[in-house]
Amino acid sequence: GKTAFGLGSKSIHVNSIILDDSQACIDSIKNSFTIKVDNESDLYKSILNIFSDELREQGEGSYLEIQNGVGNNTLLPIPYWSWIDKKELVAQELLKNIEDKRVSFIWPLIKNEIHNCQAFLSGEYLEISPIFSLIDSFGSFSKANHRFLMSATTQDDSFFIKGLGFDVEAIKKPLVNPDLVWSGEKMILIPSLIDETLDREKIINWLLRPNDKRTFGTVCLAPSFANIKQFQRIGAIVATTETIYDCIEKLKRGEFSNSMVFANRYDGIDLPDNSCRILIIDSKPYSETLTDRYEEECRPSSDIINVKTAQRVEQGLGRSVRGEKDYSVIIITGGDLVQFLKSPLTTKYFSPQTRMQIEIGGQIVGFAKDEIDEGAEADKLFVGLINKSLQRDEGWKEYYVESMNEIDIRDRKDNLYDLISLEYKAEKLFIKGDLDKACDV
């Protein structure tokens, strides 16, 4: 809200604007519209008090958990009708906390749109965000003559339409290099499918323990800090907001004896070459915001929710392979993530490249299972598969290239874009107050 480019009519005109690494920009843009304060803040306590009756009516137990700060996984929405009725009280509380940077940077954007905002409370924090994107406030972006988004993958194509106001045809037909269908080598392995003894606990305790002879980085992407004690007990280093840069630099300097764990960091970290040759993705990613978590609870089988999850996973898969000649073994643990990758109901949400990589991994796991049936040891077979990548086995490399070259890049799911575009059109009409037309869209 304090952009140097100006807001609204005071925005500086820009001819062309480029968003590099646009999937990371999406989170930054969403955060720029969102007030998020912890349960120790005065604003949190005030909003909880103002809407205590409305929250209690939704569930006495859930309300008490939130009130006592113990319901970290519990969240409740503030009903929109109560929010609208008490919007002036909300505005007053926001102004009382205007010196808080978590409020002051957002206030200029939402101060006249309180009625079009939504709020959620958990035992940890309060989240207030607009129901509709306010990207038009940034005239330097929304009114630029040319807008370019650059990315190897996209976390949320729907946000490009509803959040950035891009035309659906531009999203359906991105500019791509037809000669670069895929890049880099990813051996995706699901050890529990080789043998049931290779479960999450065994893999985590085995591969993440310290090893002074390790000649490459071993990294784990976890969905949250919930298992931090397990990782620390093993001897892994768990990166925090304050230490994440130093942890990445240690890997790039060749300090490999301790494995690294990054919680909820599926984008924004690059671990090329030897900085990460083994990447463990542990369990399915969580929704980052209370808004997304609530939507996921209400619509667990929604196509849009599943697309977001798939693209989040794909971002994680790309952390350790950062170039055409790069390679990495990616190990999948956690029953929920394994099911998401293997179920026909959800595999379809991945890109053609990722689907092929999952298929390749499934085929070589199948070969390993056949050997187990003949009496081979599961642990040794698993290590043998990993070494085919790490030791640059020619047979493996040829098999991977031949399989990846069969990808059809035209295999792209566009069916959601038209629906999202209609939602965006209806929202724009609603904001203008044309309710009848909004309902008819």
For the regions a protein language model found, what residue spans apply to each?
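Long, largely alpha-helical accessory region at the distal end of helicase-like NTP-driven motors
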Residues: 226-227, 323-441
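Structural recognition of the conserved hydrophobic beta-strand(s) that form the central parallel beta-sheet
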Residues: 1, 16-19, 146-151, 259-263, ...
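Conserved coupling segment at the C-terminus of the helicase ATP-binding
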Residues: 13-216, 223-231, 356-385, 395
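Beta-propeller and closely related beta-pinwheel folds
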Residues: 124-125, 192-206, 237-253, 259
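Inter-Walker segment of RecA-like/P-loop motor cores
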Residues: 1-10, 246-251
